[in-house]
């Protein structure tokens, strides 16, 4: 009888701790992911305002909240389509990982899908209308996503170790 109660107590205590840790981890990870999307969308809005180009700021006066190096760190490309969805031009000058042909292929795939925002692999994309048709803009989010996934893995590993530690402590204390 006592062994049965002891077992139930250990299971309930460890389950409660696991539930709380999973809830906390879930909230933190969701907030982190939303921040990645928000930052990417802000950068993309700035690029859209400048017709798919990174704006030039006055010397020594970067945009508030932006590093003067952001212009050189931001990897993006844009493809311009006419109203019937045919490619007019592509700007791949700010990315080395994607050739112009690939950029056009990605843009046509997104344009045909009818979606305005989302991810295509590690690229956050946005479709905006222009006077000639549409601009499909892609922003490389690989660094941010890589950090997010490493944080997620580390969080789960630490949580698993923590839950196991609580299990051992509760198990030992329940025998007294």
Map each language-model feature to its residues:
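Cytosolic-side ends of inner-membrane transmembrane helices, especially those
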Residues: 25-33, 158, 162-176
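N-terminal membrane-entry
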Residues: 11, 145-169
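Extracytoplasmic
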Residues: 96-156
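Extracytoplasmic ligand-binding sensor domains of the Cache superfamily
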Residues: 62-117
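Juxtamembrane segments flanking the first transmembrane helix
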Residues: 1-86, 146
